[in-house]
């Protein structure tokens, strides 16, 4: 409906210009919003105020010129009103909203799909946790955000690839190997003063015990450095297998698993450094090599090769992001923890140095999750009945609740996640509240099979059948869905889908509270119309939940 109204407004403005009423032919695209108060109509535009400066006229005079020249051959409008300083309010014929029902019935799972991203290739890299320990709840929120972003972009016509960057090179991997080796030595009866900078978790002891119990390697006959390196590879691979399983249980599937070590194995890091030395972007100072990021918007230049000859993570990240764009992606979206916010400027500088538009590289920063139980903060320890890992949370509350709640607030805001609330089967639980509507409608549809309905009902008839205010509100909410999806994709804000689904569920409850779908004393035509209406609600809830990676149960 917005598109039709926008065309009507634009034509009216140009007609007013041709008549000499509006001096300028600079007519902007009309913006249309739903007024907060229903008394102000179905849609409202402020185009008259936007045009006032160019037209050198009072906004109300511009609004009058537009309204006087509106052409409505199909009688879409009941009336128009000019309000306040120059708002134009439009009141639509109620039967028009019934077109939404037919559109959803026709499109089904494809309702909400658009082609705004057609021809654009996008990579979403997310989670990318170091393979030095199990995924924690913060990684879980990042996984939910990244996966939902990828689904939204795909729904809007982008060609999307999901990628996980495996940080399997550098100091943290050697530290992992040393930690495992030392725990192995403890099992062999050696007294070890375990370093504080090694990994302390009990999972390291479990890895060492596996090596011993399963006799996976003859570490005792190896030189210590060789044993540490073997332990590093074994531990990293084992932990990575666990990460993959945790993500699978969380319904997250990556298309590509990209190894940092591969950038060293194929000389990508060395080639990138040599390239930027030739271009003058890298210089030497104090025995180290520095990348000129300050000239490109960073607060200072950054070291890429230390004075001991070892490369920094920034060096491999430069090579990695160059590789991304070399693979033909038009946009690269990285989902990071909020604690990496200081890293954004240097990476944008690197992308700029590679010769790509800084804006083609976007970073989504995800803030921490505070776990609660019945409103009380939960101690974050590895063992003993408290929770740290994503697997622990998913095992207790399920993937549906975890994903929905992780996405229930903007990722730039900290999130309180109450484990007990996530298990409740009441309206307090946000995912249960939405899923219950889907299940309730499935139950209504099942009962309808034994109920007299009009089988020859035709939604193409221009006949006002659904005219109760709750029915119209529900159809308006359904009509907003494609716009919500596009908005969430454009802004990279998947929480908008959660907000929308809760609003739609609320609109359904208001409708169902006052109006029975299957009712003995109503006409078969009205029964069929209402049955189709709730079917479209079920369809849109199913579509929205699918974008979030949440199931739509038929019974609860």
UniProtKB/Swiss-Prot annotation:
Cited NCBIfam families: argS
Protein name in the entry: Arginine--tRNA ligase
Major subcellular site: cytoplasm
EC numbers for this chain: 6.1.1.19
EC main group: ligase
Superkingdom per UniProt: Bacteria
Similarity comment: Belongs to the class-I aminoacyl-tRNA synthetase family.
MF term (GO), any: arginine-tRNA ligase activity
GO CC terms in record: cytoplasm
Swiss-Prot/TrEMBL keywords: Aminoacyl-tRNA synthetase, ATP-binding, Cytoplasm, Ligase, Nucleotide-binding, Protein biosynthesis
Keyword ATP-binding applies: yes
Reactions the enzyme catalyzes: tRNA(Arg) + L-arginine + ATP = L-arginyl-tRNA(Arg) + AMP + diphosphate
Pfam families: Arg_tRNA_synt_N (PF03485), DALR_1 (PF05746), tRNA-synt_1d (PF00750)
Matches recorded under HAMAP family: Arg_tRNA_synth
């Amino acid at each position: 409906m917005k598109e039709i109204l926008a065309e009507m407004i634009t034509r009216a403005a140009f007609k007013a210009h041709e008549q000499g009423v509006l001096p300028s032919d600079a007519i902007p695209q009309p913006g249309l919003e739903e007024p907060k108060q229903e008394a102000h109509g179905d849609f409202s535009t402020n185009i008259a105020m936007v045009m006032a400066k160019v037209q050198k006229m009072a906004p109300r005079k511009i609004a009058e010129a537009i309204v006087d020249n509106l052409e409505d051959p199909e009688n879409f409008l009941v009336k128009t009103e000019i309000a306040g300083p120059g708002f134009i309010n439009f009141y639509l014929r109620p039967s028009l909203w019934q077109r939404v029902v037919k559109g959803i019935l026709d499109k089904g799972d494809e309702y909400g799909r658009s082609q705004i991203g057609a021809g654009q290739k996008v990579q979403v890299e997310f989670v990318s946790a170091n393979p030095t320990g199990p995924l924690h709840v913060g990684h879980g929120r990042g996984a939910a955000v990244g996966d939902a972003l990828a689904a939204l972009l795909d729904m809007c016509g982008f060609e999307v690839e999901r990628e996980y960057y495996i940080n399997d090179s550098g100091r943290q991997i050697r530290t992992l190997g040393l930690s495992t080796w030392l725990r192995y030595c403890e099992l062999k009866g050696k007294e070890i003063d375990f370093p504080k900078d090694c990994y302390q978790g009990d999972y390291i002891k479990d890895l060492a015990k596996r090596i011993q119990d399963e006799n996976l390697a003859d570490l005792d006959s190896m030189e210590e450095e060789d044993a540490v390196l073997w332990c590093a590879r074994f531990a990293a691979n084992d932990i990575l297998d666990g990460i993959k399983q945790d993500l699978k249980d969380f319904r997250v599937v990556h298309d590509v698993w990209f190894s940092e070590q591969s950038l060293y194995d194929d000389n990508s890091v060395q080639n990138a450094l040599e390239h930027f030395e030739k271009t003058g972007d890298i210089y030497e100072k104090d025995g180290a090599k520095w990348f000129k990021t300050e000239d490109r918007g960073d607060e200072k230049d950054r070291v890429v090769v230390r004075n001991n000859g070892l490369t920094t993570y920034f060096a491999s990240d430069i090579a990695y992001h160059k590789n991304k764009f070399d693979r033909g992606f038009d946009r690269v979206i990285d989902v990071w923890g909020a604690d990496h916010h200081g890293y954004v400027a240097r990476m944008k500088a690197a992308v700029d140095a590679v010769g790509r538009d800084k804006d083609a590289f976007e970073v989504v920063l995800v803030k921490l999750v505070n776990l609660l139980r019945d409103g009380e903060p939960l101690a974050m320890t590895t063992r003993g009945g408290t929770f740290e890992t994503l697997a622990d949370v998913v095992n207790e509350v399920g993937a549906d609740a975890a994903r929905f709640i992780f996405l229930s607030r903007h990722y730039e805001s900290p999130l309180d996640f109450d484990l007990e609330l996530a298990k409740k089967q009441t309206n307090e639980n946000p995912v249960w509240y939405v899923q219950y509507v889907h299940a309730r409608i499935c139950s209504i549809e099942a009962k309808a099979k034994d109920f007299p309905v009009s089988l020859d009902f035709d939604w193409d008839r221009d006949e006002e059948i659904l005219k109760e205010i709750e029915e119209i509100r529900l159809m308006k909410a359904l009509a907003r869905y494609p716009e919500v999806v596009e908005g969430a994709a454009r802004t990279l804000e998947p929480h908008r889908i959660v907000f929308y689904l809760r609003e739609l569920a609320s609109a359904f409850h208001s409708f169902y509270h006052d109006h029975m779908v299957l009712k003995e004393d109503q006409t078969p035509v009205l029964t069929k119309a209402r049955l189709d209406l709730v079917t479209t609600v079920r369809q849109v809830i199913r579509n929205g939940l699918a974008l979030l990676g949440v199931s739509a149960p038929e019974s609860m």
